[in-house]
């Protein structure tokens, strides 16, 4: 998706040129990246837009994890353990309200032993 490439370009080349000034964690660009990875374009755009509007001296700041809605289905008792999984776990879904979750990215890399 073009939005993800633009955000990664901004994070890699433009963001290091200016001082860190975001009042929230995760930063606004990281928040936008997570939103565009997990929501459709319009929902991600509006969530990011309102987050950037809140990132100013009139708001307190702090932790503001993205919230996503997701339907989880009961899993089978026969599942692959994490070390046999084909994909690496990237996000944690922390329950917030009915079918709404905080999205938290796993920042530690798995080491092969």
Swiss-Prot record:
Disulfide bonds: none
Biological role stated in the UniProt entry: Could be involved in insertion of integral membrane proteins into the membrane.
NCBIfam families: membrane protein insertion efficiency factor YidD
Name the UniProt record assigns to this protein: Putative membrane protein insertion efficiency factor
Organism this protein belongs to: Campylobacter jejuni subsp. jejuni serotype O:2 (strain ATCC 700819 / NCTC 11168)
Keyword Transcription regulation tagged: no
Pfam families: YidD (PF01809)
InterPro entries: Membr_insert_effic_factor_YidD
Location within or outside the cell: Cell inner membrane
């Amino acid at each position: 998706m073009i939005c993800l490439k633009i955000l990664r370009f901004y994070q890699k080349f433009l963001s290091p040129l200016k001082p860190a000034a975001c009042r929230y964690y995760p930063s606004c660009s990281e928040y936008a990246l997570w939103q565009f990875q997990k929501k459709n374009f319009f929902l991600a755009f509006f969530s990011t837009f309102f987050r950037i509007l809140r990132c100013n001296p009139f708001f307190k700041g702090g932790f503001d994890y993205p919230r996503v809605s997701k339907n989880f289905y009961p899993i089978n008792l026969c599942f692959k353990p994490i070390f046999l999984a084909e994909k690496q776990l990237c996000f944690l879904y922390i329950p917030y309200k009915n079918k709404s979750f905080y999205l938290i990215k796993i920042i530690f890399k798995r080491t092969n032993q």
